[in-house]
């Protein structure tokens, strides 16, 4: 099964594509869609077109996207929601089912701690996918969303579906910390 993860943003939208076979995770692609400094409609169109292109190029079976959190600034929240909507439209227009996860669910599923830092997310994604280098933070979040979805949103604290994947990499959890 191929999963496309999306980390929505108005300026930068991260994407990550993984293949899943049983408990095996395989990296396919990741990167970002950057929008031009232009009016809102142009930026949203760029996100929609970019996500639509990813769906055509990588032919995922499912998609997952991060849910919007309510920011202190309501205008920022509305703009992020619109960017997220453009990405979802690109996914749905490609016929994909779309799952949604909060940042807390994502961090807990990947790192085992809901308030994990960007650096901790990048490190765990790098280890889980056996990458030679760390992806950028937006791409790492998108890959994390795809991994979270691959394991049904299970958390490391319950050792849902990630325990076998960690064991294959020679890793395990000890008192909430990753050890090798």
Curated annotation (Swiss-Prot):
GO terms for cellular component: cytoplasm; Holliday junction resolvase complex. Its cofactor is Mg(2+). Mg(2+) 1 binds at residues 7, 138. It catalyses: Endonucleolytic cleavage at a junction such as a reciprocal single-stranded crossover between two homologous DNA duplexes (Holliday junction). It is an enzyme of class 3 (hydrolase). NCBIfam families: ruvC. Homodimer which binds Holliday junction (HJ) DNA. The HJ becomes 2-fold symmetrical on binding to RuvC with unstacked arms; it has a different conformation from HJ DNA in complex with RuvA. In the full resolvosome a probable DNA-RuvA(4)-RuvB(12)-RuvC(2) complex forms which resolves the HJ. PANTHER family: CROSSOVER JUNCTION ENDODEOXYRIBONUCLEASE RUVC (PTHR30194:SF3). This is Crossover junction endodeoxyribonuclease RuvC. The gene is ruvC.
